Amino acid sequence: MEEVVHYFLEGNMPVAQFREALALHYTNEKELFEQAKRCLNICCGSNNFAKRNDVLFSLLDVAVSISSLELRKELISELYVPVQSLEEAPSEYLVSCCLQLATIYEAEQNFELLCSSLEAVEKHGHFENDLEQLLLLRIRLGDAYLKLGKAEKAILTVRTSIPLAFKVSNDQLLMELQLCNARALDETGQFLEAAKCYYRVLQYKVPGNELIYRENLCSVAQCLLLAIPSPIVLQFLQEISLQPSVREIPFYSLVEKYLKRKFIGKEDGAFLLPFLLPHQVIHMNRLIEDGRHFLETNILFLSEFFEVSSTSILAKHFKLSEEQVDTVVADMVIQERLNASIDQCEGYITFLPEYGKANNLPNYVNKIATVLQHYGS
């Protein structure tokens, strides 16, 4: 095989004949592996860049044909690493090597090396005139970051890619970027933002979206039920209740409880656990242990119906101390998640109007305890 390479580099053999000759000069894959490495050393020393590059591509084709995954991986690595430093190293060749290695690492579930290989593809490639290929690469890289547990890097990759996707006006790519972004935000506990991205995915009219429609609708609902309680979350739940197939969500009974503004508690969190992803289960278990999430949601429910309450009545109903209720309400007001004022001397909480109360129930402090009992049933 080495003689064939020398002969070709000297210009004494056409490319097609050279490639045919390569296939005839080995009897087993191990021998091919060793001969290919020796041929690489020969062509790396050639100053005939055009011929050298032909040899490189031919050797890569030979490497890809090796059936042994381990030998194939090792030979492609051997063909890639030294060529990076060569003068006028062909970018297309380097990209091909990295993509072949990425495929192998993905099959091995070696996500760290998969990410490195895909990063190298972007480094070596020239995508200025092919933004769609760049975006496909970024989507694959974002997915690899998620599998590696680097969700923050996935978010950064996607956010720098979305403006490019708008340039090429490709809804399929935009949808896949939004889905990757949603999963990354979901995994980092940014549940409201994740819900927004999952919801955007539902809006794209692209082939195949109907197949994942219900799954993404479930993801929107899951994230909203895990998000920090706020009027925005409740309004968002109201909006998704208008979506087709919403009643097919396996935990719709809990969504309906929110829609009807029925008090929720730790038992509702426990009910949701079997429908959550592993990282969401961890988060929900924290919410169940703490309990504050459910109290905040119930206070938001009350704020839509009543103008006045008191810390003492709320504390008695929710079996908490007045100090605990006062702290929670104060925090929600400070964080602008509750439009209310607190009279700490008298212990009254005045829920300020936003768009008008949901209905005209009595608004007297001395009647709230009775109403609460009925409301919570």
UniProtKB/Swiss-Prot annotation:
Per UniProt, subunit arrangement is: Component of the COP9 signalosome (CSN) complex composed of at least csn1, csn2, csn4 and csn5 subunits.
Which compartments does it reside in? Answer: Cytoplasm; Nucleus
Instruction: Pinpoint the PCI domain residues.
Output: 190-356
Q: Which GO terms describe its biological process?
A: protein deneddylation
Q: Please classify the protein's predominant subcellular localization into one broad category.
A: cytoplasm
Q: Can you say what this protein is called?
A: COP9 signalosome complex subunit 4
Listed PROSITE patterns: PCI
TM annotation in the entry = none
Superkingdom of origin: Eukaryota
Keywords of the record, alphabetical order, are: Cytoplasm, Nucleus, Signalosome
Which Gene Ontology CC terms are recorded?
Answer: COP9 signalosome; cytoplasm; cytosol; nucleus; proteasome regulatory particle, lid subcomplex
What role is this protein assigned? Component of the COP9 signalosome (CSN) complex that acts as an regulator of the ubiquitin (Ubl) conjugation pathway by mediating the deneddylation of the cullin subunit of SCF-type E3 ubiquitin-protein ligase complexes.
Q: Which InterPro entries match?
A: PCI_dom (IPR000717), PSMD12/CSN4 (IPR040134), TPR-like_helical_dom_sf (IPR011990), WH-like_DNA-bd_sf (IPR036388), WH_DNA-bd_sf (IPR036390)
Gene source species: Schizosaccharomyces pombe (strain 972 / ATCC 24843) (Fission yeast)
Q: Which family does it belong to?
A: Belongs to the CSN4 family.
Disulfide bond residue pairs: none
